[in-house]
């Protein structure tokens, strides 16, 4: 199956708050094939289904906070199954959770078992701290994927954060090939103070062409565009990023756009 291009909706959260349906229509018009949710903005499961059907967008999955999975896993599983979403993704771990990896790993196994039983797939989405912090003598990210079986946890690799952490995203794609359905495609510049500023695809320092090539070669189902913060209008940002994606595809990038 050819790799498709989706959008992590966190990118356009300001617009979703004001006009959820209109924003999803715009995302579809721009050429994104699927969306990864980060909240549903008070919409019912029926309302989400309706706008997905209208726009033809695929529900790729949902970034679902770790604590929400602890408290309301069954509810989240039911919602995702109903809208046709396949992936439940742990998006982020708060600072206070980053010193209790054995417990987190056991929780991921539990979540993964329940997802699997319902025909869904649990993924983990990294930032930079999973590469800079260690557990059992290796980067946390590697420890998680080593200690939670592949059958219970798949990889959503945020290649931009891997690069920002000083690791090699191409090596990580190669390492987790076959376990890597989702790849976040993101660009950034490192500011003078060393902090990251996310920018539109092609405007930053990340090797996004090589990452796209590697993700496609590794059999990723989705390359998911994400921009954590947009300096201008977020809808303009996702338009600019899609223009870069189309140019990439026109130059031979093997993508369905």
Task: Pin down the residues of each PLM region.
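Short acidic, glycine/proline-enriched helix-loop-strand junctions
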Residues: 44-63, 111, 118-120, 241-243
């Amino acid at each position: 199956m050819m790799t498709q291009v989706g959008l992590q909706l966190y990118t356009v959260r300001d617009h979703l708050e004001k006009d959820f349906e209109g924003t999803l229509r715009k995302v579809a018009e721009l050429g994104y094939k699927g969306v990864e949710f980060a909240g549903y903005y008070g919409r019912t499961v029926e309302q989400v289904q309706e706008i997905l059907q209208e726009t033809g967008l695929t529900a790729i999955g949902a970034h679902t906070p770790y604590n929400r999975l602890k408290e309301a896993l069954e509810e989240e599983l039911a919602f995702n199954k109903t809208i046709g979403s396949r992936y439940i993704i742990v998006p982020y771990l708060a600072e206070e959770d980053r010193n209790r990896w054995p417990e987190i790993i056991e929780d991921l196994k539990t979540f993964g078992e329940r997802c699997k039983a319902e025909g869904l797939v649990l993924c983990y989405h990294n930032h930079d701290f999973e590469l800079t912090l260690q557990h059992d003598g290796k980067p946390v990210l590697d420890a998680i994927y080593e200690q939670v079986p592949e059958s219970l946890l798949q990889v959503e690799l945020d290649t931009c954060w891997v690069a920002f952490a000083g690791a090699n995203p191409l090596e990580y794609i190669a390492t987790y090939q076959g376990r890597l359905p989702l790849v976040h495609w993101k660009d950034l510049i490192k500011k003078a103070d060393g902090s990251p500023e996310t920018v539109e695809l092609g405007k930053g320092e990340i090797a996004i062409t090589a990452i796209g090539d590697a993700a496609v070669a590794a059999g990723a189902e989705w390359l998911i565009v994400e921009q954590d913060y947009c300096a201008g209008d977020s809808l303009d940002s996702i338009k600019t990023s899609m223009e870069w994606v189309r140019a990439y595809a026109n130059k031979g990038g093997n993508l369905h756009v």
